[in-house]
Each structure stands twice: as C-alpha cells, then as structure tokens.
Amino acid sequence: MRELKIGERIPVEAGGEAVVSRELGRGGQGIVYLVRYNGREYALKWYFISRIKNPEAFRNNLRRNIEDGAPEGGKQFIWPLFLTEQKKNGAFGYLMRLAPSGYDSFTDIYNGYKWEKPLAKGRPAIKRKVKFASLDVMIAAALNIVKAFRALHLAGKSYQDLNDGGFFIDTRTGDVLVCDCDNVAPDGDNFGIGGMPGFMAPEVVRGIAKPGVLTDRYSLAVVLFKLFFRGDPLEGSKVLQCVVMTEENDLIHYGRDPVFVYDPNDASNRPVKGVHDNVIKLWQIYPDYIRQAFTLSFTYGIQEPNARIIEKNWIQMLMQLKMDIIHCSCGRTAFLSSFEKTGEHSLVCQNCGSPIYTMSVRDFEMPLYPGAKLYRCVTEKGNDDFETVTGAVIENRLKKGLFGVKNMSRQTWQALYPDHSLREVGP
C-alpha cells in the first residue's frame, strides 16, 4: 500500500475531497491520518488493502454500518461516518470523528502511565501517571463499557475485535468512547478479523468458531477483569513457564487448555507473587459476587459460550458494586464487605470506629452515608437505567446529624420502617 502524502486529496463517496494534514498513528490494518473535509477535521483510516481478506465484502459492511449509524445515537462510539472512493489499486478508507481531548486509552490506564511528547524539541518524553479519580469513577467506566456493548448487541451487531486498544476513557468521569468500530458486523457475519490473543474467546483461538455476540461476551469479561484487577485472567505460573509466547503457546494457554488464575478446581496457574501482585492484592478486596462472576466467566464460561454473563446481568452486579462503596467520614473508601458487620443493618469502620447503617432496597443493601445515591434501575423493578438518580441520602436541615433518604423520582415508594410499619414516601 502506498502511504498518503501531506496535502493529498482523497475523494469521498458522499462528495468532495478530504485533504491529508498529517499522520496520527498506525496499526495492523492501516494508517490513521488527520484530514480536513467540508471545513472540519476528521480522522481517516487508510487500509493496508493486502491485509483485508475480502476487501469488497469488508467495504460493503463498512457502508452498511455508515448507513445504519451508531447504536443509541452514537455518543459512545467513534463510528465510521464517510467512505472514501476506491483508488485504482483498490485502496480505500473511511472518515470518523476525532476523539476529544481529556480521554486516555485503556492501555495507558491498564499500565498506569503514559508517555507524553516533551514541551521542547530535543527533550526526553515525559512519563505521566494515569489513574481513575476515584473508585466510583472506575466502576462508572465499567458500566459504560457494558452499556456500549449492550447497545451494539441489541442492534444485532457484534464488535468482533474487543481488546485494550478499543477504548478511550475519561478518568475524571468514567465516560467511555469505543473506537476501532470498522470491524463491527451483523452477528453471525465475519470478514476475516479474529481478534487479539488474550482477549479472543478460546473457541476463536482454536479456529472452531467465528467472532460474534457470544465471543464478545467472553472478551468483555476479560476487559472488565483487566480493569478491576490489573492483570490477565489466564496468565499465572503455568503461562510464565513459557519463555516466549509463540503462536503455539498462545494456542495452548488461550485456546486448547486455558486455566483461570483462580480456578477453584485447578491450582496449576495461580498468580505469582512479585509478578502478578496487582491481581493477588485486588482479588481479595472485591466482594464475593464479583469474584464468583469472574470465576464463572473463566471456568464454565470458557467451555460453554451460552453460559457467559449477559450485559444486563453485568449491569446489575456493577450497580450493586457501585452502591457497595462506602465513603467513611474518616476518609476511608472501601466496599461494604470490607467493614465489620455489627448488626442486620449496621457496620463499623475499623479505621475510626464510626457506625455505618444500611437499608434494604429491593435486592440491594445500601450503605447510608451523606451523598449516597439511589438509581432508577434500583428503585424501579425491571428497569436497567443506571444513570438517572432517583434518591439520595441527605442531612436534615433543622437537625444536624439526622439523615434521611429523599425520593427524587416521579413514583411513590413503599417503605418498611424499623417499627415494621409500611408507609408511602412521595417524591
């Protein structure tokens, strides 16, 4: 493939020409350029045409995705917008919006740092820490990742190449942008893409299945595990015995004989102290239901694709996790399960001795501390809206130190009080 030149004009199917400004980056499928089209700046992905298995089918799928538009209005997706004309040698590309500033790649978040260009020419690159502003923000990011893939799957499409390079995340808010959407295809269709080792479902690694919704769900579990535990769910002592991860070793450890690092029935691939310290430390911190979800995903879920956790169930668990966070007045932030239980609805902070009370809300146990919030998916049965706030713990304006739950929804709640009386709580 001939690389594009600065100032080169690329005809676009929708009319007009995109003018190349500079290169932004390159990967296995092609090169991404900054271009100007119709008075606006876009990113142009220009393909290495020889690396596409069936260019005509791939191009037609891109055109169909452009016509369909991104799921749910496209706010979470860097979606293909315009297709270029094909050159005589068959080369082509597509235009997409630029990722806004303030977002970091999943890879940088996973590594905990990124390298930035120096302010002055000739100076060394600057290493910057990359981490979430809070535990709440990290869980918000996890919810937004799941939400994006739920929207994609509900639209009848699968991502097919889910990996750590597929996301940009605002570490201040948890907002997520899904990129590399050019391989998205209707569930059941595939145009040659397989995925990245470590993220691909074992049946894809073995070559006995094509990527689809069920394999997406395996990859989604990998992404969430990496986000929470900063490690690979299948990389432990067994994998470390391989000096070099060759294609054959990838096939063995991620395809034919994958073993979860915390498989309850197989201890052959446990995390190694000094190498997998993040996984060892963080695995103990998360509540049992989260550990059980990942254990299911990487044991039974490896062998049985239909047993993999669906997006709706991930959202329910992540909402429980979000509500399990306790911000104690002493500054300690931890999950509810980390606090000492002193009664049916009472806990104590081991750090400062402060009492913390909880309240049952449907299937959730909600810690009651100033600023704690309820969400629509919690207060309304059958609803999975995890963004709309429907209630909050507030302090009584007349009696300092007295707290209550304010109904911020449009519905009247039925509340069971400590004296066992059932009362209505209006908005």
Q: What kind of feature is each model-predicted range?
A:
Residues N190-G207:
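Conserved activation segment of eukaryotic-like protein kinases, specifically the C-terminal portion
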Residues D216:
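Conserved catalytic-loop aspartate of Hanks-type protein kinases
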Residues K45-S50:
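Conserved beta3-strand ATP-binding lysine motif
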Residues R2-R40, G74-K75, Q86:
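ATP-binding glycine-rich phosphate-binding loop
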Residues A140-A142, F149-T171:
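Catalytic-loop of the protein kinase fold
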Residues L224-R291:
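Conserved C-lobe activation region of Hanks-type protein kinase-like domains
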Residues K400-P427:
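Forkhead-associated
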Residues I78-V137:
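Conserved structural core of kinase catalytic domains
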